[in-house]
Regions:
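Active-site neighborhoods and metal-handling regions in enzymes and metal-associated proteins
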Residues: 1-316
């Protein structure tokens, strides 16, 4: 196995290669715009004109180099890596449990900052700091607080709004703990929510619960769980406000396959860890969401996040 390391950003990984399948580490310019280094190494391995499998994230430039310079037949083989990552062993499950515990603790510790007048960006910075305090190396993705209300800005993306009375604060964050990701979500209401907001919260909880409970009934696929959760929203008349898939597997990457999504026919097997994250989004009104990491077990499931899902209201 030849390991290509970006010279500027990747040299710190060298100590971790001992005892692995890697037989040679090659330093490359970051970025290697010409591809000269890795094309040379691939030729030395005798891969000119051969069949080369790549993952789905490879750049179009790299594919063209393999085809035109190396004269290789290139096919996408991500399913091989996906299948190896999908089912976690006991050590990996232990790390996922610990990381979910950390996410719960971060949520608990960030709550005192949720008050009118606080800037959202300050909260996001503090969440990142808390993850590091609890042993995470970095965020598992660019998490955010989705703050929606009458005068709020964009639904997603960098959010610099202040928290105000009558707004919802929907968390979506995670940390990287010993190479494994967490992904977490809860919603906080700033001031007493009206009946409509309470109903939205109840629907989100029901959509998640119904999907999880289906895991106890026998074999399930990502599409089956997605259909159950979306069905709850459709029946309640808020289907168009559930604007995304129900979830995704998670582990080394925050978004792994199989997805909990339409068209996903892969069976969810014991040892797989995945998110279940229904939401209701109403622009200029609210984002109500919940997200937990779930472990598929022989008898159903284990929810790795243990912190309360009860409705949370802060004084305004």
């Amino acid at each position: 196995v030849v390991y290509f390391i970006p010279r500027l950003t990747g040299m710190g990984t060298l100590p971790f290669l001992e005892g692995t399948a890697v037989t040679k580490a090659v330093s490359i310019q970051d970025p290697d715009l010409t591809g000269e280094t890795w094309i040379r190494e691939l030729k030395a391995l005798g891969l000119s004109g051969k069949h080369i499998g790549v993952n789905r994230d490879i750049s179009a430039q790299a594919v063209l180099m393999l085809q035109n310079v190396l004269e290789a037949k290139v096919t996408e083989e991500s399913d091989l890596v996906d299948s190896l990552r999908a089912v976690k062993d006991e050590e990996e499950i232990g790390l996922m449990r610990k990381n979910a515990e950390i996410a719960d603790q971060v949520y608990h510790e960030i709550m005192p900052m949720i008050r009118p007048g606080e800037r959202v960006r300050n909260i996001e910075r503090e969440i990142e700091r808390l993850f590091e305090t609890h042993g995470c190396s970095c965020p598992s993705f660019p998490g955010e607080c989705i703050v929606l209300g009458p005068n709020s800005g964009p639904i997603f993306g960098m959010n610099y709004d202040k928290i105000e009375k009558g707004y919802t604060v929907a968390f979506d964050f995670g940390g990287m703990y010993q190479g494994y990701c967490s992904d977490f979500g809860r919603t906080v209401f700033v001031g007493e929510p009206d009946k409509e907001l309470i109903r939205y919260h109840e629907l989100v909880m029901k959509a998640q619960s119904d999907a999880m409970e289906a895991l106890k009934s026998g074999p399930c696929t990502g599409q089956m769980l997605n259909d159950i959760a979306h069905g709850v929203m459709e029946e309640a008349g808020v289907g168009p406000n559930f604007i995304h898939r129900l979830g995704h597997c998670i582990g080394k990457d925050v978004h792994e396959r199989p997805f909990i999504a339409p068209g996903e026919q892969t069976e969810l097997k014991p040892g797989m860890t995945f998110t279940v994250e229904p939401s209701i989004v109403v622009v200029k009104r609210c984002c109500v969401r919940v997200e937990d990491v779930v472990l598929r077990t022989e008898t159903g499931y284990e929810c790795l996040n243990k912190i309360t899902k009860d409705i949370v209201v802060v004084e305004a």
